[in-house]
Amino acid sequence: IMVQYATFDNRSKKIIPDNFQKEYFYSDHAKWKHDFIPKPIDDQRIEYSEGHICLTDTEIKQGNIVIETVTKAISELNSHSIGLCFPGIKNKDGIVVMANGPRIPDFKKRIKEIDAIYNDSDCCVIGECHSTIGKLQDAENCIYIGGGTGIADGIVINGEIIDFNVVHDVKRSWELLTQTGETVESCLSPAGMIERYNRLSG
C-alpha cells in the first residue's frame, strides 16, 4: 500500500502532491501467502452475477491481512480526509472480482474512515490529468498504461476520462484475452512478464 499526502487547490482545481510517501507491504505479515492463487475470473463473475460470492478460506485470510494493513496505514496518518483506491471490480460495499488478490466484499464496512473505494486505474489517470506534476494535464485524447503487479489503464477522449463502469463495451487489459487464452495483462505487466520468463526458461 502506498500512502501519499496531497492538497487540492480550489483555485486551479489541481492536486498538489506532498513530498511525504510511505509504503506498507502485505508480505511483512507473517501469515501472508505469497503463492495465493485467486479463483478463475469467470467463476468470480458468475458468483457475483448470481449474488452468491463464495470466498475460500485462504481468500478470507488474505483479505483479513489486506484489511489489517490498510487499517495500520490509516491509523498512522495525520489527515482529516482519506481517499482509497484499489484494484478489482467493486460494488457499493467492497471488492467483488479480483484478478491478482483476494476479494473483500465487505471492504468498506470494515474500514470506517472511508465512504467509497475508488478504482486504482481510474485514480492513476486522474492523477496524471489533474495533478500539478501529471504528464497528461493538457491531453485531449490519449491512452494511459502503467505497469506493476498488473496493468493500470485508462482512456481520455476530448479531455474527459472514460468511465469503464459506465461504458461497458470498453474492456480493461485484464479482461482482454489473447489467442492462447491468456489475459493481455498477464502478458504485458512487469509481474506477468517475469512470471512468463521464469516459466519458459525452466
Question: At which residue positions do the language-model features occur?
Answer:
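Glycine-rich phosphate-binding loop and adjoining helix at the ATP-binding site
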Residues: 27-71, 75-141
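Glycine/GP-enriched mid-protein hinge/lid loop-to-helix segment characteristic of carbohydrate kinases
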Residues: 2-47, 51-52, 117-118, 131-202
